[in-house]
Amino acid sequence: MQTRRVVLKSAAAAGTLLGGLAGCASVAGSIGTGDRINTVRGPITISEAGFTLTHEHICGSSAGFLRAWPEFFGSRKALAEKAVRGLRRARAAGVRTIVDVSTFDIGRDVSLLAEVSRAADVHIVAATGLWFDPPLSMRLRSVEELTQFFLREIQYGIEDTGIRAGIIKVATTGKATPFQELVLKAAARASLATGVPVTTHTAASQRDGEQQAAIFESEGLSPSRVCIGHSDDTDDLSYLTALAARGYLIGLDHIPHSAIGLEDNASASALLGIRSWQTRALLIKALIDQGYMKQILVSNDWLFGFSSYVTNIMDVMDRVNPDGMAFIPLRVIPFLREKGVPQETLAGITVTNPARFLSPTLRAS
């Protein structure tokens, strides 16, 4: 276990600034090659990452569920094939990298991620951290032990695969529980030790990002290493700009989530909400107009299998968004372009910002 002194010293490195790129379907030029990002196929240079979706899932489940009951998803092979088809569609639309923020307790299967990544030729960054479904053996751990677990998955590898995590995922909904506070503190310490960034799940309508920020800052973690997720679940621009002004990345990652037309489906409405994707996408432009282009990350929070909700929810979601992970490049980017957002800005949001965030040493200006 590293001491806090070592942890803080390890986090002190600063990097060079990144310039904008001319296109966002692929990397048009170089944004630097000296730093590397862990993916399930091994480290890549930041210039290889390209158009990146920063909050996605191949499968949303619980620890061990896929291995114990693959037939729930048809079969493991069927799930893999669906994921490959979806990622190939996203790749054809310009996506080169996704960040799969499935943690141990979301049923993360990094062998599946590696298989799908190879077949679809899309880079996948795997996550350590914890969500809302940790087993008792995790809930009994101290902050020091949780830090050790996160560091193991970043520095040594996940399980016995040798695949290293490239991001730390944590979650709160409303006021953090005492255990969630420990998880956030452990995430901050692991990030300080490694440079690997932290991304969060929030209930944006309850302004969760404010408490999360306070916990991270109490541990000495720079806001530039944290993305406050699901931030498009609110229209409270003052809440978002206050976080952005402090240096936090703002994750607008629920954009295709809308149960409009399905208002009579209580499960869909509870999960997806009744807000149009256009309303969510306009938050991107609002933050750009406020001068926070460098603080924006966009994604879909989409999946190809989902067992941690009602049984038929994946069928409903596929009807809501048949584009899957291709939704951002196929729908949102053209929409923003029509609203007058320049191509260079769109490239900054989808290529430069994610590369800077995922890089263990590069920092925001």
UniProtKB/Swiss-Prot annotation:
Protein modification: Predicted to be exported by the Tat system. The position of the signal peptide cleavage has been experimentally proven.
SUPFAM superfamilies from the UniProt entry: Metallo-dependent hydrolases
Protein's cellular compartments: Cell membrane
Signal peptide residue numbers: 1-29
One BP annotation, GO: catabolic process
Keyword presence, Transferase: no
Similarity comment: Belongs to the metallo-dependent hydrolases superfamily. Phosphotriesterase family.
Entry protein name: Parathion hydrolase
